[in-house]
Structure formats: C-alpha cells, structure tokens
C-alpha cells in the first residue's frame, strides 16, 4: 500500500492534483493496497479525506458486490486498526464485464486500437483494455472533472497474445 503514498508524493512534487484514480479490479489486490494506502495517509499522516482522489475499480471478472466483499476483507486484514469493513473509500463498476473474465466486445477492441495507434499505449482485452474502456465510459456517464490517473497494472502477456492472434 506504499504505492498510494508514492502517487501522492509525486503529485505534490509536480503540482498535480489527481481527482480520480482508475484501475482494473481482478483479484482486488491492487485496489485493496491503494485503499489501504489512502486510509493510512488519512489516519497516520493526517491527510484530509477531501484531498484524496476517488478510487474507482473497473471489475474485469466479478460482480461489483462480490468484488467489494473481497476488497473489504483484504482491507480489514491489512490493518484492522486503520481499516474498518464498514468504510471503503472506493467504488467498483461491473458495467463492462461483457460476460466475465476474458470476454470483451467490439467497443473494447476499438478502444484498445485507438489507444495503441494514437498514444502507443498497449492494452489487452481481458484486463487493462476493459478497464480503460470502462474508465472512459464512467468519466462520460458521471461527468467527472479534474485530473484522472489510470493505473496500468499489466496485461502485457495478454496484449502480445492478442496481437499474435490478429490477422496480419
């Protein structure tokens, strides 16, 4: 959960305010760590909760309810003195599951292609592409303003698998 502190430190040093952090939620480990880091910054280091960016997980495998249960269990096991299962500090969207882990649709593939060709950002359809597409849609749907940070948590092997399976 030290990564959250690193993000906040980088933001301070570079005079950037992140209003939202988005990432894929699969096993729940990364979002659990970020949320634990946020709670630690608030309770131990005295950060105001209003200074902390909202953490948004885009589920790639589970329903939002099940993903949230897993994450809350993780949070409580990190440090029960700092965490409480009744408070979370994050939200989960399962609106982009496309039927579950490993499933995707043409919209996700179009997003992946656009990001690759316009920004040289490789995304895979199973994990990071689904999450990035979900982030774009959540920003549109909820009219989120400010700066959004997308945490690319991997998926490179899946990206290369996908690239090899595409027609030349």
Give residue spans per PLM region:
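Short, loop-centered acidic/histidine patches that primarily coordinate divalent metals
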Residues: 126-128, 151-154
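Glycine-rich phosphate/pyrophosphate-binding loop at beta-loop-alpha junctions
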Residues: 1-94, 98, 152-168
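Active-site-adjacent helical/loop segments in soluble small-molecule enzymes
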Residues: 88-145
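Residues that mark the start of a beta-strand
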Residues: 20, 146-147
């Amino acid at each position: 959960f030290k990564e959250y502190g690193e993000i906040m430190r980088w933001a301070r040093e570079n005079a950037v305010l992140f209003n939202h952090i988005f990432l894929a939620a699969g096993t729940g480990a990364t979002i659990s760590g970020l949320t634990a880091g946020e709670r630690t910054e608030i309770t131990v280091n005295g950060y105001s909760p209003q200074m902390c960016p909202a953490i948004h997980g885009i589920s790639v495998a589970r329903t939002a309810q099940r993903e949230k249960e897993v994450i809350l269990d993780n949070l409580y096991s990190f440090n029960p003195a700092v965490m409480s299962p009744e408070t979370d500090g994050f939200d989960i969207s399962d609106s982009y599951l496309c039927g579950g882990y490993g499933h995707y649709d043409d919209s996700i593939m179009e997003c992946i292609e656009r990001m690759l060709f316009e920004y040289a950002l490789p995304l895979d359809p199973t994990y990071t592409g689904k999450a990035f597409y979900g982030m774009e849609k959540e920003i549109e749907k909820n009219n989120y303003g400010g700066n959004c940070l997308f945490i690319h948590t991997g998926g490179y092997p899946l990206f290369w698998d996908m690239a090899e399976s595409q027609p030349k």
